[in-house]
C-alpha cells in the first residue's frame, strides 16, 4: 500500500500533452469547426493540417458505409451516431502509412519511433502473475487517470439538434478515466425518437458482430491513454482469468476493494476506490429528460459480488464453458443479434448457452455473467466501465476472442459486410471514435496490433502452426471415424479368408505326393480366388 501511495503522489505531478483518441477532439469542439464540419487539426510537428507537409496524412471527405443494416433499428436519420461521424463532421484526417491520431501525430498500434517504423509487441499479463510493485503501479496509474483532465478530448453534453446544429457547442471537460466511461456509455445509450419516446434496441458496441472488435479497439485506446498520462510507454493492461473462479478474487483491499463493513453495496474505506465517484449511471433519468450524460458525479462506486440473481447466473464460467464457446466455428449467424444461435460472438458475449450454442433470454453466461455477478456499477451496461474491474474482465474476454481467431483462422470475409444491426457492418466506422476506424480493421489477430497475452505467447509457434490443421481434423472427425471402422472390417474379412485358405492347404498337404503338380496348383488358385 505504501508503494502505491508513493507512486500516486509522484505521478500526480505529471500532465502530459499528447495527441489522443476518443470522441470529440478539443480542437474540433468550436462553433466554427462544427459549422464547417471539418475536423482536421494541425499537427504541431510541421504546423500543417493532419501533418500533410510531412506526409503523415491528408484532410479527406468521410465516406460512410452504404451497406444495408438490420431491422433492429427501423429508423434513419434520427440519431447522431448513424453513419458516424457525418452528423458532426464530414471531413477528417486520413492518416497514411503507420501514422495515426486525430491529427496523424502518433503511431499505429504495434509501431513506435519518430517515423513510426519500429515494430514492437507488448505482453499483457494475468494480474495474479504480476509482482506487487507492478500491481501497485497499475492501481496508482488508475487513480492518476481519474484525477487528470484530458487535454485533447472533451465530451458532448447535448445532441447535435440541441447544439442548434453546431452554432451552440455543448461540450465539457472530462478526466482521462471517465472519458472512457463516457465513450462506453455513448456507444450503448438509447436513441431519442422524434415523438418524444426512446428506442432501446440499439447499441453500437454490444449485441452484434462489433462487440469483440469494438472492445478490442476501446482497450487499446485506453491502454495508450494510460501510457501517456503516466509517461510509461511500457504499460500494458492486465487481465483477470476468471475461469472456474468461485468468487471475486479481485474484490479485496489489496486489489480493487473489499466489501464495506456496514454496507454490502459499498467498497471498504481501506481501498483507494472507495472514494471514486461514478458517472453515466442513470440511463432512465437521461431518457426521461432527453439529455446526454454530462460527466457529473453521481455517487460512489457500487459492488456487491455474488449477491445477484442466481437463477439468471448460477455460477461464473468454467473452463468447459470457455472451450465449448471457442469450439463454435461460425463467428456470426442468423439476424446477428442477441438471439443468434451457434454464434461464437453471441456465445462469448453471453446471450447463448456455451454447451449448446443456443440463445437463452433467461440466462446470462460468459462475458455477461461477470457483469451480473458483480451486482453493482458494473451491472449497468451503459455505466459498467466505472468499475476498474471492467478493464481486466474485458481484457480476458479479448484474449478469448484472440484464441478463437488463432484457432479458426477466419478471413475478413467472415465478418458480415451487410445486414448487421446498425453500426456493426464491416465497413461501419466504430462509434464514437475519432480518428475513424471500421469494425473490420480490428477483426485481426492481436500480434498485428502489437500486443499478446502471456498465456498465449507461452504456447509457442508450434501450436500456432498446428491449430488450423487440428481444427480441420475436428471438423471431419466423423468421416475419419467412419473410414477407420470400414478399414477395420475389411481387414478382418481379409484375415478370415487367409486363415480359411491356410487351413484348407494344410488338409490337402498329406496327399500332395499322389497328385499331379499342375492340378495341385490349379486347385489351389481356384480355391483362393473363390474364397476371396
From Swiss-Prot:
Answer whether the UniProt record assigns the keyword Glycoprotein to this protein. Answer: yes
Query: What induces the gene encoding this protein?
Result: By seasons. Highest levels in the winter time and lowest during the summer (at protein level).
| Carbohydrate attachment residues | 90, 115, 165, 234, 341, 375
Q: What is its EC number?
A: 1.14.18.1
Q: Which residues are in coiled coils?
A: none
Q: How does it assemble?
A: Active tyrosinase has been found as a homodimer and homotetramer.
**According to its UniProt entry, what is the function of this protein?**
This is a copper-containing oxidase that functions in the formation of pigments such as melanins and other polyphenolic compounds. Catalyzes the initial and rate limiting step in the cascade of reactions leading to melanin production from tyrosine. In addition to hydroxylating tyrosine to DOPA (3,4-dihydroxyphenylalanine), also catalyzes the oxidation of DOPA to DOPA-quinone.
Q: Which UniProt keywords apply?
A: Copper, Glycoprotein, Melanin biosynthesis, Membrane, Metal-binding, Monooxygenase, Oxidoreductase, Signal, Transmembrane, Transmembrane helix
Q: Which InterPro entries match?
A: Di-copper_centre_dom_sf (IPR008922), Tyrosinase/Hemocyanin (IPR050316), Tyrosinase_Cu-bd (IPR002227)
Give the matching Pfam families. Answer: Tyrosinase
Tell me the protein family, please.
Belongs to the tyrosinase family.
**Gene3D superfamilies listed in its UniProt record:** Di-copper center containing domain from catechol oxidase
What GO molecular function annotations does the UniProt record carry, in alphabetical order?
A: copper ion binding; protein homodimerization activity; tyrosinase activity
Q: One GO CC annotation, please? A: melanosome
**Activity control summary:** Activated by trypsin, chymotrypsin and subtilisin. Activated by alpha-chymotrypsin, thermolysin and Pronase. Inhibited by its product L-DOPA and tyrosine.
Q: Which SUPFAM superfamilies match?
A: Di-copper centre-containing domain (SSF48056)
The residue range of the signal peptide is 1-22
Q: What is this protein called?
A: Tyrosinase
Q: How does it sit in the membrane?
A: Single-pass type I membrane protein
Amino acid at each position: 500500500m505504501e508503494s502505491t501511495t508513493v507512486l500516486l503522489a509522484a505521478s500526480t505531478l505529471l500532465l502530459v500533452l499528447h495527441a489522443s483518441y476518443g470522441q470529440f477532439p478539443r480542437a474540433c469542439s468550436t462553433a466554427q469547426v462544427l459549422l464547417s464540419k471539418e475536423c482536421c487539426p494541425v499537427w504541431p510537428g510541421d504546423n500543417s493540417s493532419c501533418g500533410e507537409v510531412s506526409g503523415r496524412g491528408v484532410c479527406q471527405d468521410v465516406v460512410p458505409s452504404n451497406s444495408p443494416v438490420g431491422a433492429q433499428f427501423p429508423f434513419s436519420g434520427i440519431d447522431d451516431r448513424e453513419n458516424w461521424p457525418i452528423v458532426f463532421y464530414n471531413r477528417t484526417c486520413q492518416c497514411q502509412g503507420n501514422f495515426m491520431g486525430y491529427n496523424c501525430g502518433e503511431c499505429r498500434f504495434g509501431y513506435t519511433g519518430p517515423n513510426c517504423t519500429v515494430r514492437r509487441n507488448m505482453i499483457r499479463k494475468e494480474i495474479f502473475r504480476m509482482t506487487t510493485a507492478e500491481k501497485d503501479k497499475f492501481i496508482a496509474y488508475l487513480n492518476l487517470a481519474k484525477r487528470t483532465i484530458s487535454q485533447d478530448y472533451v465530451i458532448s453534453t447535448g445532441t447535435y439538434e440541441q447544439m442548434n446544429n453546431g452554432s451552440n457547442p455543448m461540450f465539457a471537460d472530462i478526466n482521462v478515466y471517465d472519458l472512457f466511461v463516457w465513450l462506453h456509455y455513448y456507444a450503448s445509450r438509447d436513441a431519442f425518437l422524434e415523438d418524444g419516446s426512446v428506442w432501446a434496441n440499439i447499441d453500437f458496441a454490444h449485441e452484434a458482430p462489433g462487440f469483440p472488435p469494438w472492445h478490442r479497439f476501446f482497450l487499446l485506446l485506453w491502454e495508450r491513454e494510460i501510457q501517456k498520462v503516466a509517461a510509461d510507454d511500457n504499460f500494458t493492461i492486465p487481465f483477470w482469468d476468471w475461469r472456474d473462479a468461485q468468487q471475486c478474487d479481485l474484490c479485496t483491499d489489496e486489489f480493487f476493494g473489499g466489501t464495506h463493513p456496514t454496507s454490502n453495496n459499498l467498497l471498504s474505506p481501506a481501498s483507494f476506490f472507495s472514494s471514486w465517484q461514478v458517472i453515466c449511471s442513470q440511463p432512465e433519468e437521461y431518457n426521461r429528460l432527453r439529455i446526454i450524460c454530462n460527466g457529473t458525479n453521481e455517487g460512489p462506486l457500487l459492488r456487491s459480488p455474488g449477491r445477484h440473481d442466481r437463477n439468471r447466473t448460477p455460477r461464473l464460467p468454467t473452463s468447459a464453458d470457455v472451450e465449448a464457446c471457442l469450439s463454435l466455428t461460425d463467428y456470426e449467424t442468423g439476424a446477428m443479434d442477441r438471439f443468434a444461435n451457434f454464434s461464437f460472438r453471441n456465445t462469448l458475449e453471453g446471450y447463448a448457452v456455451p454447451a449448446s450454442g443456443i440463445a437463452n433470454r433467461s440466462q446470462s453466461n460468459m462475458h455477461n455473467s461477470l457483469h451480473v455477478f458483480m451486482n453493482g456499477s458494473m451491472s449497468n451496461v451503459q455505466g459498467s466501465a466505472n468499475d476498474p474491474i471492467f478493464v481486466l474482465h474485458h481484457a480476458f474476454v479479448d484474449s478469448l476472442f484472440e484464441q478463437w481467431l488463432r484457432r479458426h483462422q477466419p478471413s475478413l470475409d467472415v465478418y458480415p459486410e451487410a445486414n448487421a444491426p446498425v453500426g456493426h457492418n464491416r465497413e461501419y466506422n466504430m462509434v464514437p471514435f475519432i480518428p475513424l476506424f471500421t469494425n473490420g480493421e480490428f477483426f485481426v489477430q492481436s500480434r498485428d496490433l502489437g500486443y499478446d497475452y502471456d498465456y498465449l505467447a507461452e504456447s509457442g509457434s508450434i501450436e500456432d502452426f498446428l491449430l488450423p490443421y487440428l481444427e480441420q481434423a475436428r471438423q471431419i472427425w466423423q468421416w475419419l471415424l467412419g473410414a477407420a471402422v470400414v478399414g477395420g472390417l475389411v481387414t478382418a474379412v481379409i484375415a478370415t479368408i487367409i486363415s480359411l485358405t491356410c487351413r484348407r492347404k494344410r488338409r490337402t498337404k498329406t496327399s500332395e505326393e499322389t497328385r499331379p503338380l499342375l492340378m495341385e496348383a490349379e486347385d489351389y488358385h481356384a480355391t483362393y480366388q473363390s474364397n476371396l
